[in-house]
C-alpha cells in the first residue's frame, strides 16, 4: 500500500473504537488467526492453480466443510470480486473458513461498538462546509445562504439550526474583540500622536482624510484635492457661491514691544518701492491687514525671503508711544525658518525664554502597549471598565508642537537691548478662508454674537470668568454691541469686494454648534439687513472703525481658557437628548462657551483692469481646539471645500504668484523647483522610451525646470556683446531702438517658409552654430569686446548682481504701459507716455538695466487663439515673418519648430550594446576587467534617452525663436474662455523685444509647450 493509500485508510479508520479490531486482509501461509467474536481457529487453504492458466488462481470454498448446520449463520465472509485475469477473493486472494460457533455476547458487544462508532462519525461534522454547500452544484442556489426554504425539505431543519448558531456566534464574537481593536479603542489619542510624529495633522484632518487625496507637505498632512470631480464646481463656488479652505498650517510670528523699536528693526527688511511697509497708516492703527515682501536686512532688491501678511493690534489709547504693541506676521511654512532667523537677527533677540508648553510623555513603544493591553486576571469576553488614575492622571496632549518646530525647542526669544519679544504662535490658532460672494451670508448665519450676561443671571459656576468681567464694564458692552451691529450689516452686502481691502473686525461669538440646522441648507443674502443705507454706505466707504477691530484673541490666557473649557460634543448631544421637545433650540445661558474671533477681509484680484474683486472673501481666526466646531456649521450652510489644488487655481485666476513655486529668487522657491524637477524626472524615467517624448528632438533643453540663472546671464551677455558697436555707430545717441536687425552679432531667426531639409540642416548641430556665431562676434568686436566683458564681470562682482525679480511698482507700471500696443498716428510710432512716465527710449531702457542687470519680470499671458499652456512652457520672441503671416491671416496659429537631431542617441545605443556584450561574456572574463572598466560605464549611466545630458548650451539661441522666459502656471481659463498663463521673462529680453517690435503689434509673444513643436501667439501683460 502506498503512502497516499495508507493516509486515506488511516483517515477512514480514525473514528473506530479502540476495542474493535477489523481485519484488513489475510496473509497466505500464516498461522492461526482468530476472528472477532469467534473461538474456533481456522486455517487458510492454499489455492489450486486454475486449469489452462499459470498465473491465475481460484479460491475454492467447500460448503460441506461445516459440520454443524446451525453455523450457517455467517459472521464474516469475503466477497468475490473480479480482477484482471480472473476472480479473486479478498484483497490478497485468500479465503477463510467460517467459524464453527460464536459467542453471542462477545459478538453483540463488538457489533455495538461498531454501531456507536458509526453513529458518532455521522453526528460529528468533519468538514467546515454548510448544508447548502454539500449539495451538488446543479442543485445550489444563491438564495440558499439566507433563505432556508430554498433548500430541500430534508435539509431545512439542519440549515435553520446552523443559521441560529451563526447568529449566536456573531453576537458572542462582538464581545471578544482582538487585541488590536481593544488597543485602538483604548489608546486612540496615543496612536494619533504617534502618526503625527513626522507630519502634523490639522484639526480638520479626519474630515479631510475621508473626502480628499492627502499629501505630506511642509511638515503637515494636507488635503490636496477632493476625491470627486470638482474642478468646475470649485470655480463656480469661488465665482458665485462660497469655497472653504483650512489655512491653519500657515505660521504666525508675534512681535511684542515698543512700536518705535519694532519699526526700526523691521525697516531694513522691506522697501517702499515694492509697496506699503509695516509703517503704513491704516495698517499701523490695526484697521487693515497689510502685505509685503521681506528681504534680508539692507539687501533689496536681492536675497528675497518671501511674501508675508501682517496685522497690528489696535491701541487702547491711540497716540501713546509708551504702550506695548503686538504685531502678527503670517507666512507660508516653507518661509518660516529663513524669515524667523532674519527677524531674530534684526531685532537682536538671542536669548530664548523658557518654554511653558507642557511636553507630553514619550510615546509608548509597541512592547509597552502590549504590556498595557494584557489582561492576566480578567476574562476576555467580559466588558471591562477603564481604571481611573484619579488625581494622578495626566492629560494626553493631542497635538505636540507643529510641523515646523520641535516641541522641545524654545518658541519665544527676547532682546535685552530693544526689549522686543518674538513668539512662534504656529498651531496656536485656526485660520479658515471663505472665498466667494456668499461669504457674508454664511458667516452671519453660522455665527451669532455672544449674549451679554445680566446682573440677575447665575454666573457663579460658569467657567467663563473673563466674559463675566467684560460684561460688568459698560464700555466693553457698548463696544460688543457695535461690533455685533456691524457684523449683522455684512449679511445684506452682496460681495466681500465691496468692503475696503484688508478690513479687520473683532467679535466674540457663541458656540456655533448650538445653532446647527437639522439638514444642510444654502445661505442667501438678506436685503432686509441693509435697510439702514447710511450705515451701509459708511461701512463701504470707510470700513470698520478702529475701536471695533478689538478682539480678545490677542490675549493668550483667554484663548487658553476658551480651549480648555470647551464643552465636548458628547455633553452637547446628551443635553439635546434631554430636551422635552426634540429638535428645539438648546439654551445654555451663562454656561454657553464664548469664543473670541477675528474676521479679516481678503480683497481677491486687485491688479489689472478686468474682474477686479474676483475671489474676495473672509479669513476667520479662531483659538485652537475649536476648528471642527466652526467647520461643520460652515459645511451645513452650503460651502464647498477646497484643498491645495484649489488654492493654486485661486491664485492663478487672480494672476498673483503662488507660494513657493512662483518665487524663483527665494530659497524656498529654489528648493521647490528642485523637488519638482526630481519628481518629474522620476515620472519620466518610469515610462518606456517609446511612450515618452524625446525632448532633445523637440528642442527642449529643460523640460522639468526653468534655468532662470542661465536665461538672465545669456541675455546680459547678448546685450553687452552689441552694446559697444551700437554706441559707436550712433555717438550722438540718435538711435533710440535696440533693434536686433541693426546689430551685427545678433542672430537672425530662420524663416518658416524655407524647405524643411534646409531648416533641419541649419539647426542640426546647435553647438557648432553657436561657436561660429561667437567666433564672428569676437572677430568683429576684437579686444574691445573682451575688455567690455571684463568690465561687466567686475561690475557684477562689485554690485553683487544675482538673480532677482523686479518688484518696483514704479518700474512695473512703466513696463505695463510699454507692453500694450499703440496707435500708428502717435508721435514716433510710440505709445504716448502717461503722467510721470517715460517713453520707450534707449536711455530709459539702459537706466532700468543699470539697476537690474539680471532681473525677471512677472507677466501674464493670454493666447490669441486655441491652445492650453502648461508649466515649463517656453516664452519666445516672434520673428518678422511671423508678424507678416499673422497680418495676412488672423487665423494663423503660429510657426512650427523643426525637429532637432539627437546627438546622445548613438552614445546611448553604444552603451546598451556594451552592456549586452558584457552579459554575454563569461563570468571569469567579466570579473577580470576589474573596476577600471566600470568607470566609463558608471559615467555613461547618467545618459537618459530623450533628455539633454551635461551642461546646457545657450538657452536663448537653441531654437529658431529666441527664448524670453518660462511659464510657471498655465491652463484653460474658465473666466476668459481661452488659455492663460503666468510666468517670468527676462527684463533685458523684454526691453529688447519691445524696442524692436512694431507699434501696433507690440506685446505679442510665442508660446511653445515642452512636448510640442507648435508655437502659438499670445499677448503679454504686466498687471500692477
Swiss-Prot record:
Modified residues (Phosphoserine): 367, 584, 729-730
Annotated Polar residues bias: 15-24, 53-62
Alphabetized Pfam families for the sequence: POP1_C, POP1_N, POPLD
Keywords: Disease variant, Dwarfism, Nucleus, Phosphoprotein, RNA-binding, tRNA processing
Biased composition (Basic residues): 1-14, 911-923
Localization in the cell: Nucleus, Nucleolus
Cellular component aspect of the GO annotation: extracellular space; multimeric ribonuclease P complex; nucleolar ribonuclease P complex; nucleolus; nucleoplasm; ribonuclease MRP complex
InterPro entries: Pop1 (IPR039182), POP1_C (IPR055079), Pop1_N (IPR009723), POPLD_dom (IPR012590)
Main location as per UniProt: nucleus
This protein's record includes keyword Cell inner membrane: no
Entry annotated with the keyword Cell cycle: no
Effect of residue 675 to Q: In a breast cancer sample; somatic mutation
Assembly behavior: Component of nuclear RNase P and RNase MRP ribonucleoproteins. RNase P consists of a catalytic RNA moiety and 10 different protein chains; POP1, POP4, POP5, POP7, RPP14, RPP21, RPP25, RPP30, RPP38 and RPP40. Within the RNase P complex, POP1, POP7 and RPP25 form the 'finger' subcomplex, POP5, RPP14, RPP40 and homodimeric RPP30 form the 'palm' subcomplex, and RPP21, POP4 and RPP38 form the 'wrist' subcomplex. All subunits of the RNase P complex interact with the catalytic RNA. Several subunits of RNase P are also part of the RNase MRP complex.
Disease as annotated in the protein's UniProt record: Anauxetic dysplasia 2: An autosomal recessive spondyloepimetaphyseal dysplasia characterized by severe short stature of prenatal onset, very short adult height (less than 1 meter), hypodontia, midface hypoplasia, and mild intellectual disability.
Name of the molecule in the record: Ribonucleases P/MRP protein subunit POP1
